[in-house]
């Protein structure tokens, strides 16, 4: 996104207790950055995600900050897994929070790309929010997933037959097995 820095809405007093305090800190730092010659496009605001296990209002407060930043034309980022810290089945909470954050204007997230449901939810939320190019990205992702699943299904019924070298290379490309592709 070309950001020059990530704005952490913290003060000498620490983490702000209210969203209003957080928004005031964002505005103060943004004004200083602009005074120093930066543009709002140079700034990415961290939503400062807290765990809902300790603060039941943490998600709403972060989502409100993301909305505030969108209204100000500022990009946003947040560490998704912070929201679910200390809770069971964290991936469910992380996925739900990500989709809510995208609808509020989240620009980017620090997340685990190996969590398929989380990544799929991001593609789906972008599509539903009518983000430019999201329709094609969603279709391409789902087509890739379908191709892998179909190939896996077809392979399951062909255990008695040896795969051709071409089929083995295809499987390696689809599954991302870089080391195996050289062997095949």
Which sequence ranges carry the predicted segments?
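ATP-dependent carboxylate/acyl-activation modules
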Residues: 1-42, 50-77, 81-184
